[in-house]
Amino acid sequence: MSPPLKLTRDTLWSALATLGRRTHRPVSLVLGGSAALLLSEALRRPTDDGDVVTSEPDLGQLQVLIREVAEEEQLPPGWLNGSIQSYTYVLPPDYRDRLVALPPFGPLRVSLLSRRDVILMKVFGLRPRDVADLKAIAPRVEELAFVRGQLSRIGAREPEKASAMQAFLAEWEAG
């Protein structure tokens, strides 16, 4: 049987439970992106992977376990990856105050970026799937205001990206 191309909430939950059973030391993960939305039940569509924002120990030290879980659960080998880590500067310094903890999976502790922080990352990304996810979760006025409040900070580092985000928000709010 070939591995599934997409992860559902149930397959992701099962894989995290398996990872928790297989690890013999404390592990802490913060997930973002669509995986965070799926696990918090804000999004229904499957995702390609779980975006690891931070991990303790470092994600590289967990690769053998992650691959073993992929094989056991018939998941893509990169079902958990740190590709989002290149963009963590987009998150405000206090994002950890808003993390949402999942129930423990044995020694594995998993927290999710808050919905507003995921929305910020999606507006920053603006890939077609990010826009589709935003349409699916229908950000509230206060969530969009939060994103708007981050534009000057992001603009100090990436002015063109902040301008694109501003234009997207204006178009979004215009309907």
Predicted stretch roles:
Residues 1-175:
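Compositionally biased terminal segments of proteins
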